[in-house]
Amino acid sequence: MGMMQEFKEFAVKGNVVDLAVAVIVGAAFGKIVDSLVQDVIMPVVGKIFGGLDFSNYYIALNNQDPNLTLVEAKKLGAVLAYGNFITIALNFIILAFIIFQMVRLLNKLKRTEPPAPEEPAAVPEDIALLREIRDSLKK
């Protein structure tokens, strides 16, 4: 099964254990992923797109000057801060992918463990007695 297909199944119909792992790992790695996106990935993406800072992308909802920073525009009124949304969405995608890889690894480890050998069932007493009678008749 391909990795993208597994990710789709995980995202669409994950179970409670997957969700619990996601919450725990997400809490632990959230700040790391946030730093990765804000300090490493977004500056590179901004450089590719002409030195733009996505965190300051917004649409002014009450005719503010479009050259203001996001903080200044928020002081003057309502803004639609879609640049921040792009950054947070990228954080989510990276975090979800990391969690998916961890769950995928756990599932792979579960599948590779050999099943425990089954102990033979105890022979019922009447069957054991019949076998003894049979064996004594053969002699």
Swiss-Prot record:
One of its GO terms (molecular function) is mechanosensitive monoatomic ion channel activity. InterPro entries: Mechanosensitive_channel_CS, MS_channel, MSC/AndL, MscL_channel. It is found in: Cell inner membrane. Pfam families: MscL (PF01741). Keywords: Cell inner membrane, Cell membrane, Ion channel, Ion transport, Membrane, Transmembrane, Transmembrane helix, Transport. PROSITE patterns: MSCL. The chain crosses the membrane at residues 10-30, 40-60, 80-100. It is a multi-pass membrane protein. Belongs to the MscL family. This is Large-conductance mechanosensitive channel. It comes from Janthinobacterium sp. (strain Marseille). The gene is mscL.
